[in-house]
């Protein structure tokens, strides 16, 4: 429904037809109301997040349309919006955010809507979305505050702040949901008895976390304009995008250093000491945040909307892609391990002991 609505609204605005635009708006609201009533007339979901995510899914498709029109794949759907919207939407970072929201977030919203409809738990996928949303929101707000577009904040920025406020409320709703894990006592005891040498996968993750922490801190220092020759050479050869005046990449590296850095230390502790029940939730939030951040960073570093002097040089692209893709994927595997084999991180409850 988002596609025809975007096309009609864009056409009405360009034709300066106020009556037609008003009619289209009323018709859209009526169609959405009737559709929602028809779909949930038998049993309306009691969870208010059902309606929040339904609206978000609608706007995710709009964001996908924005990304496609920016790449000239389609035309005439959101032309007026691209001219009047906040300037950040036309940056490489905003461009990649549109694709992320239109693809990944759209899928996540559909999964959570389906889980609510069927009465299933959506806490895990919800925590992944929480991490992705928080990273996007923090970089957006701080990037607008310190970047070159800080003086171009318009009414749509206030609308975006409303979206962030509702999403923060949704985050608290997700965190308040109980965990659905049910692990046998024997499995927990068996996992706790294994030493690190008998957990080769965890050993590999620990070996990864140490250089990942160093890489995270190093890029944060680069974003802070460290005068070290290593930092200067790295910026010039591999990631000149960190110097982009929009400030989004610089803010993203600083956020990663301040939050991902401590996470890697905490994750090391969680993999070494049994009974850290918070480990699966923490990896879900972090993997969602890192996936969103790295997708935006990698895409914007190579995108044609980034000025040529700030793009990754052609001869450095293989190394850049290898390092950043590994830095993105390994935390996803760690999250998978913690969520689907959580016995090592669980504590036996008194009820399980009595059984």
Report each predicted region and the residues it spans:
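Short, hydrophobic transmembrane alpha-helix segments
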Residues: 9-19, 36-44
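Hydrophobic transmembrane alpha-helical segments in integral membrane proteins
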Residues: 1, 14-24, 201-205
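Alpha-helical transmembrane segments of multi-pass membrane proteins
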Residues: 2-12, 213-226
């Amino acid at each position: 429904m988002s596609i025809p609505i975007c096309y009609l609204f864009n056409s009405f605005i360009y034709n300066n037809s106020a009556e037609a635009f008003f009619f289209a708006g009323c018709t859209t609201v009526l169609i959405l109301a009737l559709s929602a009533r028809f779909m949930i007339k038998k049993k309306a979901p009691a969870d208010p997040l059902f309606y929040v995510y339904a609206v978000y899914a609608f706007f995710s498709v709009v964001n996908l349309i924005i990304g496609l029109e920016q790449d000239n794949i389609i035309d005439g759907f959101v032309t007026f919006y691209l001219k009047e919207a906040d300037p950040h939407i036309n940056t490489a970072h905003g461009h990649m955010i549109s694709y992320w929201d239109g693809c990944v977030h759209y899928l996540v919203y559909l999964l959570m809507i389906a889980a609510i409809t069927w009465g299933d738990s959506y806490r895990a996928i919800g925590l992944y979305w929480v991490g992705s949303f928080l990273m996007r929101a923090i970089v957006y707000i701080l990037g607008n505050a310190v970047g070159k577009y800080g003086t171009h904040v318009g009414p749509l920025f206030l609308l975006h702040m409303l979206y962030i406020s509702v999403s923060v409320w949704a985050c608290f709703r997700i965190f308040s949901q109980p965990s659905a894990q049910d692990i046998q006592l024997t499995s927990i005891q068996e996992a706790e008895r294994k030493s690190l040498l008998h957990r080769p996968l965890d050993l590999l993750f620990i070996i990864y976390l140490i250089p990942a922490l160093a890489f995270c801190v190093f890029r944060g220092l680069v974003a802070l304009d460290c005068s070290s020759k290593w930092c200067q050479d790295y910026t010039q050869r591999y990631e000149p995008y960190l110097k982009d005046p929009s400030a989004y990449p610089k803010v993203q590296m600083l956020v990663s250093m301040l939050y991902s850095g401590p996470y890697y230390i905490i994750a090391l502790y969680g993999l070494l000491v049994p009974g850290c029940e918070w480990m699966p939730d923490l990896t879900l939030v972090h993997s969602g945040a890192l996936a969103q951040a790295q997708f935006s960073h990698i895409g914007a570093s190579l995108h044609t909307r980034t000025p040529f002097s700030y793009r990754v040089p052609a001869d450095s692209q293989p190394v850049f892609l290898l390092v950043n893709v590994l830095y993105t994927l390994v935390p996803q595997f760690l999250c998978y391990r913690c969520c689907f084999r959580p016995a090592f991180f669980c504590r036996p409850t008194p009820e399980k002991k009595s059984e």
